[in-house]
Curated annotation (Swiss-Prot):
InterPro entries: Conotoxin_a-typ (IPR009958). The cysteine framework is IV (CC-C-C-C-C). Glycans are attached at residue 45. The modification 4-hydroxyproline is found at residues 55, 60, 70, 72. Belongs to the conotoxin A superfamily. Keywords: Amidation, Disulfide bond, Glycoprotein, Hydroxylation, Ion channel impairing toxin, Neurotoxin, Pyrrolidone carboxylic acid, Secreted, Signal, Toxin, Voltage-gated sodium channel impairing toxin. This is Conotoxin SmIVA. It is found in: Secreted. It comes from Conus stercusmuscarum. The modification Pyrrolidone carboxylic acid is found at residue 39.
Length: 80
């Protein structure tokens, strides 16, 4: 197969994929089906802290009342 023939086949493949993808975009009416069909429980309706939920399961209770002890810094050049 010559270079001219390979280039022609390449152009045909590109043209065919473009023609196939245009009608599918029109059929979707410009909407993203994956977003529209997402379960409502996967999308949070409000932004809350971890303590806005059940503190025992979502985060340590010390984070809710600011009683967590700070972690000691490790020695090193950046922490001096």
């Amino acid at each position: 197969m010559g270079m001219r023939m390979m280039f022609t086949v390449f152009l045909l493949v590109v043209l065919a994929t473009t023609v196939v993808s245009i009608p599918s975009d029109r059929a979707s009416d410009g909407r993203n089906a994956a977003v529209n069909e997402r379960q409502t429980w996967l999308v949070p309706s409000t932004i809350t802290t971890c303590c806005g939920y059940d503190p025992g399961t979502m985060c340590p209770t010390c984070m809710c009342d600011n009683t967590c002890k700070p972690k000691p810094k490790k020695s090193g050049r950046r922490n001096d």
